A protein has these predicted regions:
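Helical "substrate-binding/catalytic lid" subdomain
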Residues: 165-266
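Rossmann-like NAD(P)-binding element
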Residues: 50-95
Length: 276
């Protein structure tokens, strides 16, 4: 039986683990120091707690955590990389290419090898199949996940290409959600909300239909989207500082939406508005 190690048992990590176990893989992880909720998700997904010695026998290691935690995972795995012939690490986090290159350099210093990964799409389920894009040396080895029900796709570009794809796609998708949300809120504050929705129903019906799904789904995730917007800003900064400033502002926007979600405001108003 093929063993795959996964670090991260959030919504995506646990769903990926569930898909792998359903298709016949053994999935191991490190539960030491994890929250009670993370441990519960991991066990429900069929993940088994493992030592570094157990993980050394894995075919590969997947890191699926919030972008700010990606460097911590690399340091946590230092004992694994110090072992003879450690499995390759696929960093599948929403980090920009610059961050991925720094992480890969650190993994190499520790004695391991890192492949750049990027997940696009919702967590695996009966109705969803996200794509795992891969780039850099060793990507073909990680693409073997395909036989366990993961849609893994190798890109032609070097390490960082998968991260660039994720940054661009995420910037378009989550940037668009932010713009729509901001202007619906502005219309509500200024007495034009119902009229704006009526106009969208006539001239932008696909946008309105997407917004009815995406905006309610966004608020509980806003705290996680804030650091992703900062990664996109860092990606854009060297070549397009003006564009980078947009995504830094979007990071602040999502931080404010996260606070609004905690307070239980905004979303009820928007949900009522979007259902008219």
């Amino acid at each position: 039986m093929t063993t795959i190690a996964i670090i991260g048992a959030g919504a995506m990590g646990s769903a990926v683990a569930g898909r792998l176990t359903q298709r016949g893989a053994r999935v191991v992880t490190r539960l030491e120091g994890r929250s009670e909720a993370s441990c519960a998700r991991a066990l429900t997904a069929g993940m088994q707690d493992a030592s570094f010695e157990d993980m050394a026998a894995a075919a590969l290691v997947l890191s699926i955590v919030p972008p700010a935690a990606a460097p911590e995972v690399v340091e946590e795995l230092a004992p694994l990389f110090a072992m003879p012939s450690p499995p390759p690490l696929c960093d599948a986090n929403a980090c920009n290419p610059q961050t991925k290159r720094r992480l890969a350099a650190r993994v190499a210093e520790l004695g391991g090898q890192m492949v750049d990964g990027a997940i696009i799409g919702p967590p695996p389920s009966d109705t969803a199949d996200p794509r795992l894009y891969l780039s850099g040396e060793g990507a073909e080895e990680i693409a073997a996940l395909t036989k366990f029900g993961i849609d893994a796709r190798v890109l032609k570009g070097p390490l960082g290409a998968a991260a660039a794809l994720k940054m661009c796609y995420g910037g378009i998708n989550k940037g668009g959600i932010a713009l729509t949300t901001a202007l619906l809120l502005a219309a509500e504050r200024n007495g034009a909300a119902d009229d704006l929705v009526a106009e969208l129903a006539v001239t932008q019906k696909p946008l309105l239909e997407r917004s009815r799904r995406q905006i309610p789904d966004m608020y509980p995730k806003a705290s996680r989207w804030n650091p992703e917007m900062l990664e996109i800003a860092g990606f854009l900064e060297p070549d397009d500082p003006a564009a980078a400033a947009i995504w830094r502002a979007l990071a602040r926007f999502y931080a404010e939406r996260a606070r609004a979600d905690e307070a239980g405001i905004e979303l009820p108003v928007l949900e009522a508005l979007l259902q008219t």
